[in-house]
Amino acid sequence: MRAVVDTNVFISGLMLPHSTPGKVIAAWREGHYQLILSEPMLSEIGAVLNYPKIRKRLAWNDLTISRSLTLLRFEAEITDIQGTQAHVPRDSKDNMVLATLLASEADCLVTGDLDLLTLAELHPICTPTEFLLRIF
């Protein structure tokens, strides 16, 4: 299975490894699915990892963040979303996430974002709990 994992799930999973988002990240690390990201999503993950509150919670420094982003570049499938039209009516900042799903033709977008979840009737979008039920 190929899945786009939204930034909110990814960061939550790093911060709370025993939570449902943490289990989504663990399932990727264990090879249960292929993680799909795009360059804009990688940039967003990097920006969020650099928030002082997140850095403190994870106890990560610049080197740890840099290494983690490099690992993501090599381990995730990076999809080019240029030219992909995506529109999230309630939050245009989510357009890049939906564009990643559409451009990659992934099996699922895993998110906790209500603006994206409202589009689940039109696209393969699910919550972390629903995703875990699908892969296990």
Where are the predicted features?
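Acidic, PIN/NYN-like endoribonuclease modules and their adjacent C-terminal/linker elements
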Residues: 102-110, 114-136
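PIN-domain endoribonuclease scaffold, especially VapC-family toxins
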Residues: 27-84
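Active-site neighborhoods of divalent-metal-dependent phosphate/nucleic-acid chemistry enzymes
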Residues: 73-108
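Short, well-structured N-terminal submotif of metal-dependent ribonuclease cores
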Residues: 1-37
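Nucleotide phosphate-binding site architecture
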Residues: 11, 43, 55, 117, ...
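Residues at secondary-structure transition points
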Residues: 19, 36, 60-63, 88, ...
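Alpha-helix N-cap/helix-start capping motif
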Residues: 8, 39, 62, 113-114, ...
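Short, flexible helix/strand-to-coil boundary loops that buttress conserved ligand/catalytic motifs
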Residues: 14-15, 49, 120
